[in-house]
């Protein structure tokens, strides 16, 4: 039985019937409880990612490595799987945001993505999202050398949100705008010069924030961008 506290009726019913005590995880960040109740194994997460981590914790313990896809780690096969009666509690992580940056990915990663998935798109990113969650991570700076996460495939940010992955942009991509988004509009926007081109750059930034306002993002704030140039070329 899997569910998030306050989001799934059967979990809330087990709490009301005092079959599970979630006081140690309720309201916490990315925490979960795994407990045997009668003949059931219950996973109750404090929030969305807590629930996901609980499921993947069991998956790893029964023989599925987080790296089964990316590193071809064989999945262990078992004739029987046994669960000891009792309760296991995973507290909130000490580091709130934990993730990776797919940096300087061209040509190797990008070429592989085109060959396997038709591009660095949502079909590829779902495998990255799953890896992050299996590793109990939650944060991603996407590929940006020649890619624009939000524009190349509009399903990519939608799936990130569905999977519970917090998205950001790299150290020289302010306000949720990818490097590639600027380069392909450079004639329209003008020079990366905040002193003399403030109005156009503000508009460019504002559009990025408006586009992503419904998603869980961490926003890079700064004016270094466009091949690491300062905001006055």
Per-region residue spans from a language model:
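Structural preference for beta-strand elements that scaffold enzyme active sites
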Residues: 97-99, 139, 166-168, 218-220
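Aromatic-lined substrate-binding rim segments of carbohydrate-active enzymes
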Residues: 147-171
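Structural motif
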Residues: 2-7, 44-46, 103-104, 143-146, ...
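Contiguous, structured surface segment used for ligand recognition
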Residues: 1-92
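Conserved small/polar residues in nucleotide/adenosyl-binding loops
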Residues: 227-233
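An acidic-aromatic substrate-binding cleft motif
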Residues: 70-117, 124, 130-143
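Aromatic- and acidic-residue-enriched carbohydrate-binding clefts of CAZyme catalytic domains
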Residues: 106, 115-117, 131, 161-163, ...
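Well-ordered, non-membrane alpha-helical segments in soluble/globular domains
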Residues: 121-125, 151-154, 195-207, 230
């Amino acid at each position: 039985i899997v569910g998030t506290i306050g989001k799934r009726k059967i979990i809330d019913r087990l709490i009301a019937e005092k079959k599970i005590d979630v006081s140690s995880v309720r309201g916490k960040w990315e925490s979960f409880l795994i407990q045997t109740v009668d003949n059931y194994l219950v996973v109750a997460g404090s929030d969305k990612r807590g629930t996901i981590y609980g499921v993947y914790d069991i998956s790893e313990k029964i023989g599925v490595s987080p790296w089964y896809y990316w590193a071809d780690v064989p999945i262990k096969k078992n004739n029987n799987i046994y669960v000891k009666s009792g309760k296991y509690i995973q507290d909130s992580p000490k580091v709130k945001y934990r993730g990776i940056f797919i940096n300087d990915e061209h040509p190797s990663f990008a070429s592989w993505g085109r060959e396997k998935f038709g591009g660095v798109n949502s079909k590829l990113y779902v495998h990255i999202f799953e890896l992050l969650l299996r590793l109990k991570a939650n944060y991603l700076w996407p590929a940006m050398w020649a890619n624009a996460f939000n524009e190349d495939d509009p399903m990519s940010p939608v799936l990130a949100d569905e999977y519970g992955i917090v998205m950001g942009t790299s150290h020289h991509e302010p306000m949720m705008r990818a490097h590639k988004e600027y380069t392909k509009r450079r004639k329209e926007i003008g020079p990366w010069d905040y002193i003399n081109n403030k109005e156009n750059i503000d508009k460019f930034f504002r559009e990025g924030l408006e586009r992503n306002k419904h998603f869980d993002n961490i926003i890079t704030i700064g004016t270094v961008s466009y091949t690491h140039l300062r905001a006055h070329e």
